[in-house]
């Protein structure tokens, strides 16, 4: 007989830094087991924010799926800024290249709703614009 799903939660933790806390307690899962497995699974992504989808079952067991780091976080890292513009229409806080956008889009491709790398790049460019980050090299991009 299949296990009964009690809850599905989408959370974000820093890689290798998941700790038992209120957000995990509310799921009713074995918190030490989750934190150990999550931290082991994210060893190669140290310093990044890692979104995770946790499926909790009625017997306190769980499954989880790691997602790619959010585009906004990656853009801030590439642009070397702490936060985006408070008003992206009038402020520009940083500049990134189209090559930076391409590398982020290639990394994010599995989690994006895009069929081509160009479509993925357009989504990342939209995120950059909303953060007040200017993209250089747009004249080559259609």
From Swiss-Prot:
One or more lysine residues are methylated. The keyword Coiled coil does not apply. One of its GO terms (biological process) is translation. One of its GO terms (cellular component) is cytosolic large ribosomal subunit. Keywords: Methylation, Ribonucleoprotein, Ribosomal protein, RNA-binding, rRNA-binding. It holds the Pfam family Ribosomal_L11. SMART domains: RL11. Forms part of the ribosomal stalk which helps the ribosome interact with GTP-bound translation factors. HAMAP family: Ribosomal_uL11 (MF_00736). This is Large ribosomal subunit protein uL11. The lineage of its organism: Bacteria, Bacillati, Mycoplasmatota, Mollicutes, Mycoplasmataceae.
